[in-house]
């Protein structure tokens, strides 16, 4: 078959597919109107940089997992707030029945516009999620959490009944159904997950996430979040030092990490990240306990500098912009070196 005949055959096949399944069902990748992946900020400057595209990708499945009280829900509430700032409509499937509206409001979530559901069973939760995603009007949906998606058979059964892998089967079936709708509607779907210990593991990490392996495969981004220390004001604990690791990333190089502070009552400390990343990238100068920007001293001690940046948002925004530009340039250089 000559090249002309091949092209005619392909064109005829594409025309037949489009006639059967609609325009846009098949095309050459270069013809796609939006090749670049859009992203929504996580609310953490360091994590946005670690993810490589400035946030979590639209139209993808995201898994956020970690131990108890590590900041999983806080991070997802920041995601909702950032999406709402850009005019997005968000939904929260609260399978754990533990969402605190007052805390969400403090983190910048518009609770009047947030769609919330507190389902009774795992099937109900995932059906609600499917209906909302298929509507095409939802920009982000949070499912909190996979561990709380209890199958109907388990709820209706006796307390001691063995329900072997029923949750894993439920998740596998749901993700097969959801994944095409998520991509088509460009909806960010975030699953919060918990950690369990595998029994009898001799080598490697005994930690695993709940709900089987399906979510590990379907997720484009998997974020491991851990509390690594406390932030104290004299004797009072006022926050947590948090470390996140991007353990899977289909849209950028994985295994990058970010550290940030989660302050009780106000969430991720943007100012703390600006100081740490500013010093690391030599945008902010540190001499002893003094910090300087553009040769002007902006404070002594990290907490005082944080307060200064809160009171001077124009300087804070200026430093943040430089950090994002510098980090983007460094990422591009690293990618070019990898390709060589």
UniProtKB/Swiss-Prot annotation:
Q: What this chain does, per the record?
A: Can catalyze the hydrolysis of ATP in the presence of single-stranded DNA, the ATP-dependent uptake of single-stranded DNA by duplex DNA, and the ATP-dependent hybridization of homologous single-stranded DNAs. It interacts with LexA causing its activation and leading to its autocatalytic cleavage.
Please give a single GO biological process term from the UniProt record.
Answer: SOS response
Protein keywords? ATP-binding, Cytoplasm, DNA damage, DNA recombination, DNA repair, DNA-binding, Nucleotide-binding, SOS response
The protein's location, in the record's own words, is: Cytoplasm
Name of the protein described by the UniProt record:
Protein RecA
Q: Which source organism?
A: Rickettsia prowazekii (strain Madrid E)
One Pfam family from the record: RecA
What gene is this protein a product of? recA
Q: Which GO terms describe its molecular function?
A: ATP binding; ATP hydrolysis activity; ATP-dependent DNA damage sensor activity; damaged DNA binding; single-stranded DNA binding
The domain of life for this entry's organism is Bacteria
Q: Which Gene3D superfamilies does the UniProt entry name for this protein?
A: P-loop containing nucleotide triphosphate hydrolases (3.40.50.300)
Provide the residue positions that the database annotates as binding ATP: 66-73
Q: Which GO terms describe its cellular component?
A: cytosol
């Amino acid at each position: 078959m000559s090249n002309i005949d091949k092209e005619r055959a392909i064109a005829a096949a594409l025309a037949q597919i489009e006639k059967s399944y609609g325009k846009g069902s098949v095309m050459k990748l270069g013809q796609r109107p939006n090749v670049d992946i859009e992203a929504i900020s996580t609310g953490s400057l360091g994590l946005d940089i670690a993810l490589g595209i400035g946030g979590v990708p639209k139209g993808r499945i995201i898994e956020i997992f970690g131990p108890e009280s590590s900041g999983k829900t806080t991070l997802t509430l920041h995601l909702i707030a950032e999406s709402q700032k850009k005019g997005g409509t968000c939904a929260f499937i609260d399978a754990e029945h533990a969402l605190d509206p007052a805390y969400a409001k403090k983190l910048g979530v518009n609770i009047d516009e947030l769609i919330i559901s507190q389902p009774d069973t795992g099937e109900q939760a995932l059906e609600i999620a499917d209906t909302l995603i298929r509507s095409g009007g939802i920009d982000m949906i949070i499912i909190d959490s996979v561990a709380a998606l209890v199958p109907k058979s388990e709820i209706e059964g006796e307390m001691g009944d063995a329900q072997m892998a029923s949750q894993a089967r439920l998740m596998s079936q749901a993700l097969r159904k959801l994944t095409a709708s998520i991509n088509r509607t460009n909806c960010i779907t975030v699953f919060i997950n918990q950690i369990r210990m595998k029994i009898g593991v001799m080598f490697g990490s005994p930690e695993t996430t709940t709900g089987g392996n399906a979510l590990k495969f379907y997720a484009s981004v998997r974020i491991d979040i851990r509390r690594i220390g406390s932030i104290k004001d004299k004797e009072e604990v006022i926050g947590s030092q948090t470390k996140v690791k991007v353990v899977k990333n289909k849209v950028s190089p994985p295994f990058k990490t970010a550290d940030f502070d989660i302050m009780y009552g106000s969430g991720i400390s943007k100012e703390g990240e600006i100081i740490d990343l500013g010093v690391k990238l030599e945008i902010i100068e540190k001499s002893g306990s003094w910090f300087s920007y553009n040769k002007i001293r902006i404070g002594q001690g990290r907490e005082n500098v944080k307060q200064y940046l809160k009171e001077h948002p124009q300087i804070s925004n200026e430093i943040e912009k430089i950090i994002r530009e510098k980090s983007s340039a460094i990422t591009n250089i690293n990618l070019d070196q990898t390709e060589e």
